Amino acid sequence: MGWFNKIFKGSNQRLRVGNNKHNHNVYYDNYPTASHDDEPSAADTDADNDEPHHTQEPSTSEDNTSNDQENEDIDRAIALSLLEENQEQTSISGKYSMPVDEDEQLARALQESMVVGNSPRHKSGSTYDNGNAYGAGDLYGNGHMYGGGNVYANGDIYYPRPITFQMDFRICAGCNMEIGHGRFLNCLNSLWHPECFRCYGCSQPISEYEFSTSGNYPFHKACYRERYHPKCDVCSHFIPTNHAGLIEYRAHPFWVQKYCPSHEHDATPRCCSCERMEPRNTRYVELNDGRKLCLECLDSAVMDTMQCQPLYLQIQNFYEGLNMKVEQEVPLLLVERQALNEAREGEKNGHYHMPETRGLCLSEEQTVSTVRKRSKHGTGKWAGNITEPYKLTRQCEVTAILILFGLPRLLTGSILAHEMMHAWMRLKGFRTLSQDVEEGICQVMAHKWLDAELAAGSTNSNAASSSSSSQGLKKGPRSQYERKLGEFFKHQIESDASPVYGDGFRAGRLAVHKYGLRKTLEHIQMTGRFPV
């Protein structure tokens, strides 16, 4: 059947298609539509005579020569008849068939005559194969007349052997119906009616030369891009490809916020608390020191010194619950960024600080400017704070704890728990420690407080150890975002890559897990190192 395949494939129209992962080939195949109105051929005219049909018995050996000559004449007549019939079908099929040259037509006719001429001969009305009578007027395949039941030469009837082509039994993968004559698609290892090959996204037929796939589902390229091509969470545009043709984007390691690399250099603001970038359709609140705060973080932000006092009392109770009560009264002040930086410069004990300082435990006498009262914020901008000077006097080893204003409650609390540990160790007479040990154990305490807060929030208890209330500090169960924010602050502590805060925390956490907090602190006080 290779020769037939060559003829049929000669009329294929190939459309090469593909997506960003694979190229898919679609074939539009055109086959002649069967004609039921073919005019009779010369052999048909002979068969329509009024003379009665005579059935001849098989010839003897003496008649072989004459019979061979007659058979050759018959074969030639059949070939011419099939050639004329093929030309009639080609003209009727119109747009569904591709023109072929005369040599190809003659080759097709000769091939068919060879098949017909070599078919077995039977007497009129005899049965063939499964008891089906093949004779004048019999239908063959798809209800089309095959050979027209014509009688050739001396009344002998030629019953053609059924020739089954796989293409006659094509099943559409879309509707599971048979694909008859005409145009069809071959793609995704299946055959389709053109109207059945549809986009999985919009359910409309795919008629373009290229398409995309996800799994075994086809998509228009535009539909695939809309569904699967990543969009920037900042500008809401499709993330562009780089010079190598690959989609390149940035993503926050915790929030998985995807954004174009260009936003890292185009002054797109970040929230100073959660570090998420500001989307184009969202307005962050700008504090008077230039920091930006997203609306979710603003919802629980601690804005002035008075508002922070209940939280301070709660953390004091947290330490007392660990048998680590801070005996002296240490002032807590919320300050702006400039005041915090100035106080850090005035501190002489040489503590290590991060580039963005958000808390400070002071041991020197100085005057700082504290946020006494918060101001209402206008549209997208903080109106300002009412500040007043505060004179720090040295009554003990610790003069004050300073915290940056405008941070969410959980972040403010974790910073306060960190600075409280500095104060506790100084008041307990700990020796001067290496930076990684001191900052590491302070980070352990901040992490422990966050753990306790999130656990208390899961039992619908907010600040379980504090009965005080304050404007802006809400009671009741935490919102889903606030719990997520608390997990983010824990993640920041755990994933810190700095050798002082990050490595120090991991070493201190391991020691506390192995020996307990009390024994770890005793070992630090005696040796200045974490127990191993």
Swiss-Prot record:
Pfam families on file: DA1-like, LIM, UIM_2
UniProt-recorded Gene Ontology molecular function terms: metal ion binding; peptidase activity; ubiquitin binding
Protein's gene: DA1
Remarks, miscellaneous: 'Da' means 'large' in Chinese. Plants overexpressing DA1 exhibit early senescence.
Domain UIM: 69-88, 101-120
Effect seen on changing A77G: No effect on ubiquitin binding
Impact noted for substituting L362F: In sod1-1; suppression of large seed and organ phenotypes of da1-1
Glycyl lysine isopeptide (Lys-Gly) (interchain with G-Cter in ubiquitin) cross-link site: K95, K221, K348, K376, K381, K391, K474, K475, K519
Organism the protein comes from: Arabidopsis thaliana
Effect of S113G: Abolishes binding of ubiquitin
Region feature Disordered, mapped onto this chain: 26-71
Protein name as annotated: Protein DA1
Alphabetic keyword roster: Developmental protein, Isopeptide bond, LIM domain, Metal-binding, Repeat, Ubl conjugation, Zinc
Entries under SMART domains matching the protein: LIM, UIM
Conditions for induction: Induced by abscisic acid (ABA).
Compositional bias (Polar residues): 57-68
Keyword Metal-binding: yes
